[in-house]
């Protein structure tokens, strides 16, 4: 086992609406390296447990990443499977004034999202080289998901609703899909 992690309770600060739990999977189970690399939802960073030796010498793809948690997960995936515990044992705070998400929404949000997607794409490709291409197809699929989610975040719904993105669209929760459909079919009512 290269990584253990668990679910989290979500504590919302401010006016954000979200799920009350952060549960990447339903039920405790083994997670394959491919699932770690190309996951449909995030892992609570505070829950990540791994061997210290994994971070003794960090590769370039880690050092140049805009965030640290996903590259850590990729390092773990390169070492093997993970164990997920479907038990909330930490709190994931959402909407704090100094949080990464809040800071991303200040200023030119679209440019920040595009820059983030470009940096993460470079990071994934760096991991692909680091792992000797063992997970190449999985990495490329993860990049497609990342680009899709960037389009969701920046409200490029024509791309989001494109037939080629149907797989990723179906992974969105029902609330998000409802609001995308509402905003695209009744934009004046949505803006009201």
For the regions a language model picked out, list residue spans one by one.
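Conserved donor NDP-sugar-binding/catalytic core segment of glycosyltransferases
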Residues: 1-19
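Conserved nucleotide-sugar donor-binding catalytic segment
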Residues: 6, 24-108
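Inter-domain helical "communication" segments and dimerization helices
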Residues: 16-18, 63-64, 117
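Catalytic core of nucleotide-sugar-dependent glycosyltransferases
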Residues: 27-31, 35, 88-96, 102-134, ...
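Short, conserved alpha-helical segments within structured domains
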Residues: 68-69, 139-142, 185
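Amphipathic alpha-helical protein-interaction segments enriched in hydrophobic
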Residues: 135-150
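Membrane-interface aromatic/basic loop that binds lipid-linked glycans or pyrophosphate carriers
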Residues: 147-192
